[in-house]
Amino acid sequence: MLGFSYVKSAAAILCVGCLAHCLAFAGPPVASLGHTRLQGAWTSSESAVFRGIPYAQPPLGPLRWKPPQPIALQPGVRPAIQPAPSCLQAFVGWNRADEDRGSEDCLYLEIRTPRVSRKARLPVLVWIHGGANWGGSGGWVTDSGLADRGIVVVTVQYRLGVLGFLSHPQLTHESPHRASGNYGLMDQIAALEWVKRNIAAFGGDPASVTVAGHSAGGQDLGLLLLSPRARGLFTRAIQQSGTAGFGLPPRTLAENEKLGATFAAILGVPQDDMQIETLRAVEARKLLDAQMLLESPSLADNSFIFLQAVMDGWVVTGPPAELLRTGKSAPVPLMIGNAAQELLLYGGDSAARRAVARIFGPSMDQALSLYGLRDGTQPPDDPILGSTAMQVAADDTFRCPAEFTAAAHAAAGQPVWRFQMERAAPGQARIDHGSELTFIFDNRPLNIAVDGVRPLLQSYWVNFIQHGDPNGPGLPQWPAYGGKRAYLAFTQSGPEARTALRAPICALLQRP
């Protein structure tokens, strides 16, 4: 039986420990940015979260279609608890929540950190959300469990649709760089500059910043990797189901200016010297209605219209394919991958045949043979890659562009780790677009069958964010891409190292 003095001593120690814990979290977390103190909130896991942090002036009125402008925060305490609105966006079927809470005043970021201390110097992840540059937001990633594994997580809002990617001759003329059309990318660059200046106040290391993006976020990150404007702002990159160009033909500045003139005509704005000023005065929701009528002559599907890279000569200095081939990508470690069944192509094998003719051109016959479509028979579905139509769509838009990006980056002497997700997210029948996101970022409980997958994927991602290499103790080896074009397949039975993903098909495409 324990003596009374032992029990009393143990109780005293427990009380002291509890008191120290309570004192540590007695007040809200505060990050000091010069004369401004941002007041956040503690999470249930005792990390700190700061929301609604402006990184640029609201792009309203005369600042519509202008590069992001620096913002000076007022001295004193500023609450950073309420989420910022999503960037204004048209409803396109999957983004109702973000569309409902959208605002043109949206240039904010969120931060979740394990320690609010300048001495912590923790690695940083900056997340660029997807959504075809039409819609979406990234706040849900702020609530991921990565902060509980020693990562400072930052999510960025950026202008979307015509508000983020419109060119116009008058906009080009008023620019000191004679460029227009990449305001959404400029927002991302401004956010990265803000992170470099200020992340130490939140416990982050400005010399250890990884940028990750999914879908359009992966495409935008690919363009940032190629842009001299973003050079030196991050040290590692993770492109998930998105590459610079997405295999789509880029638009020249002149082509995007022509699209801008068409946009003004749709709105009935007079074609005069004040056209852009008149457009700046148009109610924002009317702009969104008009953007739904825009068409790009080089696209088979206009839902990709804001995924076509705009070669403005300032942010994007040339065709992404050429920039990649000539070694213009930033010299940083890269993780890049895709899901096995990224995209549906409606219409079955007949649609697949039409797509092959359009995509492969002079190599059409070879491609038809590789897909098993040449003799007019209907090939069986692949258990991992899905139907033939699904394979064609994913190869063209995701899988082969990721291969080309990995190969170009490796040829420039940079370390590359390539992956393909080959297991569905919980509750999903298909290994579709974003299948890996649930395992990496979602904090909700998973069923027993997939509980082991989350720590595995999170460990690979955390290791890469920390060290630029996903490998670590206790993990199956993930070989670098290198000359063998190695990749890791995340299968139903676990990770499998393989080589030369879809090599015969991708050799016929040869475009990023």
Please describe what each predicted stretch is.
Residues 236, 244-245, 278-281, 285-451, ...:
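Substrate-gating cap/lid region and adjacent catalytic-acid/histidine neighborhood
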Residues 2, 24-182, 303, 343, ...:
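Non-catalytic accessory segments of hydrolases
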Residues 281-282, 468-494:
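Polar, surface-exposed loop/tail segments
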Residues 159-161, 212-216, 420-427, 476-482:
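Short, solvent-exposed turn/loop segments enriched in Gly/Ser/Thr/Pro and often Arg
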Residues 10-21:
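Bacterial N-terminal signal peptides
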Residues 91-272, 276, 293, 314-347, ...:
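Serine-hydrolase-like catalytic core of hydrolytic proteins
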Residues 1-12:
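Bacterial N-terminal signal peptides that target proteins for export
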